[in-house]
């Protein structure tokens, strides 16, 4: 089958990019590809059998027209000016059978005009982390970019030490970022901001294109998508680590996996980025930061969208987030109906977990085994303060009895939203260390496991992390 590519970005937004081709690595070789995703995109298997090829920037497919995008943004709350694709190149936009498109973005593809002081490269460590994280999030049901392939090489890339150079093929319906809009707003080119908005509406919100109120309705949906995404992050214990405005997806996708982390111990103020000295991007601050970022996006639209309309959309953010978060947390607790004591029970559990430094994922998964008429719980042994747990657990069982549903039905619901497996940093690190020695077995094995996060397991993927694996510090270097 011949793949079809279109050039919408190149044709319609000529001032938002520089056209250039990838710079290949030395002795590049394909070490992993996403068979399931490739099948979904109708990519012929033969493309993965001819060396690094397009996956390593050595060749382009017919119809591809590579370019690096320019955007700007706020980083850690401070205006950073022009940024852009410093090591990534958009190879093309694949046209799918249903008429939608999928960006092929090659990360680590070499120097671009937006590399600033960087070398345009990515290291094997960071490409493995992003491939694992994006696929883990996808199978958890959270909107995200996807990973299609990883190429490693003999090219050394220098970070804290010399590391193997690598490339990741990332795919997404769009790489539109808040930072694209900021770039032209701060250059006082509001008409180009409007052109970006029109491009987004035309291709991703086409049902609004002929509506006289299209900009307000579109921005309201961007707010809602962002609120929903952040709510989902919070329910699975995901910390992004670097929520700069240039890392915010207009479509509400999880974008740019750098120093991310999933909670091990329940620690509301968890900071996964060792460069985040003030805790701006801590786990519990993510909802507030996302709203701040939306406010920056709204500012760029203010020359042609009424401020009252923008503020009305922003004012809806908290309620949308709380609604999505509340619905999912009630499911995690096994509540079928909504009762007034639900929030108090959840907050009491969180307080207990924080005091005891309980494992976030294991706690909710083990809670899924609760039988409402039994005082016994496998979770009890996870707590030192048994009296405090017993008191909470008695109230929790009483609440369960208000819903007329069998234990088996409720347990099935809970186990469908409380994963047994999340991508803990130590699991990724183990796969990385093996891969850097040339052994890809664990990389493939872990990818396979992450496809079934809600299935029961009895291996170390779902055990408590080892002491060395807790609070692994991760930097932005990639």
From Swiss-Prot:
The keyword Nucleotide-binding applies. InterPro entries: adnlytase_SelO, SelO. Its cofactor is Mg(2+); Mn(2+). Pfam families: SelO (PF02696). Mg(2+) binds at residues 247, 256. The keyword Metal-binding applies. The active site is at residue 246. Its EC number is 2.7.7.-, 2.7.7.108. It catalyses: L-seryl-[protein] + ATP = 3-O-(5'-adenylyl)-L-seryl-[protein] + diphosphate; L-threonyl-[protein] + ATP = 3-O-(5'-adenylyl)-L-threonyl-[protein] + diphosphate; L-tyrosyl-[protein] + ATP = O-(5'-adenylyl)-L-tyrosyl-[protein] + diphosphate; L-histidyl-[protein] + UTP = N(tele)-(5'-uridylyl)-L-histidyl-[protein] + diphosphate. GO terms for molecular function: AMPylase activity; ATP binding; magnesium ion binding. ATP binds at residues 84, 86-87, 107, 119-120, 170, 177, 256. Keywords: ATP-binding, Magnesium, Manganese, Metal-binding, Nucleotide-binding, Nucleotidyltransferase, Transferase. NCBIfam families: adnlytase_SelO, PRK00029.1. Belongs to the SELO family. Nucleotidyltransferase involved in the post-translational modification of proteins. It can catalyze the addition of adenosine monophosphate (AMP) or uridine monophosphate (UMP) to a protein, resulting in modifications known as AMPylation and UMPylation. This is Protein nucleotidyltransferase YdiU. It comes from Shigella sonnei (strain Ss046). The lineage of its organism: Bacteria, Pseudomonadati, Pseudomonadota, Gammaproteobacteria, Enterobacterales.
